[in-house]
Amino acid sequence: MIRPRMLRSLLALLLGATTGCTTIQLGAANLIETAEVPRTEVAYGEGPRQRYDVYRALDSIGRPLTTPAPVVIFVHGGSWESGDKRGYAWVGEALAQLGFVAVLPNYGLMPSTRFPEFVDDVARAVAHARARVTEWGGDTSRVVLMGHSAGAHIAALVAYDARYLATQGTTPAILSGFVGLSGAYDFLFDTKLLRRTFAGPPEREHDALPVHFVTPRSLRTLLVMGEDDRTVNPRNTRSLAAALRKAQVPVEEIWVSGTHGVSVGAFARINRGESEIVRRIAAFVRATP
């Protein structure tokens, strides 16, 4: 039998003290998530990855809520070239147990889907889910977009660059806030991965950086970052927070000890009961803008 202290240490190693989020790490979090949460898969387009999972909000004893619940649309990471919504089922189940409707979309991945097409996918999923979320008990006045790592980058573009949701006939005003977990928002194209994904004409590189699209009308924002992150430089969070403050947009920051997985790892079952990250994100989601 694995004792709780041993399990906590293992999960801390896998999710908090690593340089990235691998299949093994995600599998560990899924393994210990034992809740039975109603899940529905929905197609938002015709592509094989144009689908999202919906997790119904639960009350304190595990029953589906009967009153409208806040909604969190969570975009997974994976360096724009890997990852899957089912690998993050534990995040959807955690959000549901916190009393939220959780929507986890897949999106096209590199190299078959290039920038900005994968951002278009997420915008399409956001608009589609927002239009239907009352079917699953969601409160349309409280729909927060959240992402981790590359998913935070994509989600930030959808949240701040109004052109993406405009192609879906709507605006970022349908959202009540943005939460970024260890996200890339203001970076140099100084690695093979980043050049392969984003480099090109100046306008393309400009459009790849969420920090360029902050305005006084931008969504209120909560940013979470590990102080020792070596996968995404913490300067990304500092730069975005500074731009938001300059535009007088409400922004909160949570800085914690740990590396790249620590922000999303807070939602793992063994962590979330005492996590400041989870507590503050939950309060942010529940708040009425």
List PLM regions with ranges:
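Short amphipathic alpha-helix adjacent to the substrate-entry channel of hydrolases
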Residues: R86-L104
